[in-house]
Amino acid sequence: MTAAAVQIASQVMHADATLARIYAEAVRAAPADELVRAALLCHLAEPSTPAARLADDLCTSLDIVRAAYRACQGSAAVTRLVNSMYYPHRMRWSFATTTVQEWQRVPDRPERIRAHEPVLSETVEIHPTRGTCNYRCAMCLWSDQQELTYATKQLDTGGLMTAGGWIRLLGELRENGVHRLVISGGGEALINPELPSILTRAAELGFEIHVYTTGFSIRPGSPLFEALLRCHRVRFSIHSPEPITYDRIAGTRPGQHALDRVVGNLGALLCERDVLPTVGIGFVIQPFNYDQIAAMVDFAADTSADWLDLRKDEVGVTDGLTPDQLTVVRDQVRAIRRRPPVDTRIDIGDELVSIANGHSPDRSRTTECLGRYFRPTIGAYGHLTPCDLKAEPRFAQTGYDLGSVKRSQVLDVVAVSSQRRVADDCVQCMPSSRTGNRILHKLLDDLASGIRLDEQPFS
């Protein structure tokens, strides 16, 4: 066993006193074997490490790693740890669990991915927008609507997708095993007058529908409002609990009373829903609002939102936070973790958890981008891209355009592009894509090493 690997892992799992306590509870439930516990420690400290590499790092066997993985399966203590606001890889673990379940439902999927055969993910993001947004959020990919546009990036060929085109596409996606539809990006979808018919058809086809919106354009009682009530999750982007800061970030005018209007729409959805949709808030930390995190938690609880996503600007649109500002952020997140609200779930992104724990976030890359296998995206003009970031004008590059679904069936586009290798070398990469890439590479490497899906710790 190499002391260096264990020491590094121990630093991660003991970076915070509460994290260390929860981790200790997980270890107590594990076998007493020293090597198994070392493997468990290193795995929990970085769950995307392939089993063979973990065995090499510890100078041990795959059987020891398997034993550590078994210690995770069905362990209530491990479940408490990996679902904790103190665990820096909570979202990574959750993604791994979902992926293992998906691959177990479709057993040939890993082999098809490895062979670069056509594969359509169970989750697809679509951008049924008008190719624009009525906000100018400072940290958003749409903050620049002059130079970084579909036209300047040569993504506007053939015009926008029509409502009929989207509805045809929905049928193709459903027929080919897609069941989760994410409507996020490409501008603000809710200002597209055709969106109600698109959402209604998606609901009729049985999709699980997630919508991300500013919330400004919702009108209670309208066809759009009724369509949103048929969705599963609706997340409002609210980046300040204070009207002045909200307007400064969003680019809205004081006379619009935008924050009040958005909060009213959020409340109307909560009031009119049956069981679904769940309704939450997304808050992106940036120089304008870095000191408002605690106030935002109170705000979310006061609105009765089901959850609040706390994230950093993780693709560098705004200026980075200074060391002093990061200290303010860290102190607020630590205070929130000690006393979270009772009824509103606080979802802290992995990067923020690392910062609160006193560690630098992990932004390492892999050898190949596999984003097309877990969240491919279809942009407003019908271009299929490997991920949501490459469908946006700010980060789009024609080399990442996998084809158009406007004139071809989506599975044909996937098939034609399946042999194209996509390098994991983009200037920026969304945290969800970094997470997905790391986990897919781990699972594929593990299968090649003889670790079955039902042996994974995420099973």
Per-range role (PLM):
Residues 3-5, 9-12, 26, 71, ...:
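Flexible mid-to-C-terminal extensions adjoining Fe-S/redox cofactors in radical SAM and related proteins
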Residues 57, 79, 83-233, 319, ...:
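Conserved alpha-helical substructure of the radical SAM core
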Residues 57, 140-143, 249, 372, ...:
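Small disulfide-bonded, cysteine-rich extracellular recognition modules and tandem repeats
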Residues 1-123, 135-139, 425, 429:
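Flexible, acidic/Gly-rich N-terminal and inter-domain linker regions that tether
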Residues 127, 131-134, 363, 420-423:
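Processing junctions and N-termini across compartments
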Residues 145, 186, 239, 313, ...:
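Flexible loop residues that form catalytic
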